Amino acid sequence: MIKYLGSKRLLIPSILETIKTVPNIRTVSDVFSGTSRVGHALKKSKFRVLSNDYCEFACTLARCYVEADDTLTADAEKIIRELNGLQGSAGYFTETFCEKSHFFQAKNGERIDAIREEIEKKSLDEPLRSVLLTSLMEAADRVDSTCGIQMAYVKSWSKRSHNPLQLRVPHLLARSPHGSSKAYCMDANAFVMSNEFQGVDAVYLDPPYNQHSYLGNYHIWETLVKWDKPEHYGKACKRTECKVKKSKFNSKREYFETFKALISNIDTKLIIVSFNNEGYLKPDQIVDVLRTKGDVCIRQTPYKRYVGAQLGQYNPRGERVSEVSHLDNIEYTFYVSSDPSVVSALNKD
């Protein structure tokens, strides 16, 4: 899966274990799906999964790893063999992300251009189209020249950027015995109030924590998926949409009320919330909101900050303008249930 700030790889075993302790959980919703690492793990554990994300690239990943079933693997393998045989042809991607900026070597940018144009020409149905786009995203991610996010590229080419671009077939899973999984691209608060959210037994929430927009952090993937060849700005060649498409979860002023509204519209057997010590809300504020839905258990997981945050900030001349404040973060996981026995069992662990 793609490199992603805030990946929940370390939390997945605990999340799965907890959900399995609650009786009659069949459908689980991942409301801020990101890379779909959590959604993929849930589907692998036989749950029916409803994924959602505000960004189109994240929804594409969810269509691949959550919505698509393994019955599509043979078709994907055939087309990916064909795409891997294409010669490069410079276009928008090469010009924007290899020449005007240096996120990728030109030889790989040219192949990305050629492969993406070929996918577009095929006019494939979903979710097969998203399986191929995910394969391309992940191939590009393996040869980029960043510290993990697309706010900037490194001054000297990364070692991996010299490798040739090669598509791989994503690992698709069997359909859940509880029904087909589905991916949506909606505002989170609108999603939990929609008909699509009906029948959800448990929900996992991993909202943005602060002002940093995932659209801005991963704008290249959004452009690659939409293939709208947008106008852009700055050294990172961000799509201009980044200036106007904002989530209320990126606003300190609006965050608390938006989070409170989100929780108020969820009525499931279990709610799981991830949050970070660098976020706008303090743990006690989150607990106060969650207690309206039942008893709350909190767990903490320490982890290293992403590599870019460990370097400090530098001006255009390469001079350090700020020191690193801390190297470690804490991930809080809140478990909420109206069934006291569920939270009681968690508190004994």
Kindly give the residue locations of the regions a language model identified.
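Conserved acidic residues
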Residues: 26, 200-201, 269
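Conserved Class I SAM-dependent methyltransferase catalytic core
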Residues: 247-293, 297
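SAM-dependent nucleic-acid methyltransferase catalytic core
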Residues: 33, 95-217, 229-245
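Glycine-rich S-adenosyl-L-methionine
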Residues: 223-262
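S-adenosyl-L-methionine
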Residues: 1-32, 37-45, 60-61, 68
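Conserved phosphoryl-transfer catalytic core
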Residues: 57, 62-114
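Conserved SAM-binding motif I beta-strand of class I
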Residues: 49-53
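C-terminal catalytic and target-recognition region of SAM-dependent MTase-like enzymes
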Residues: 282-348
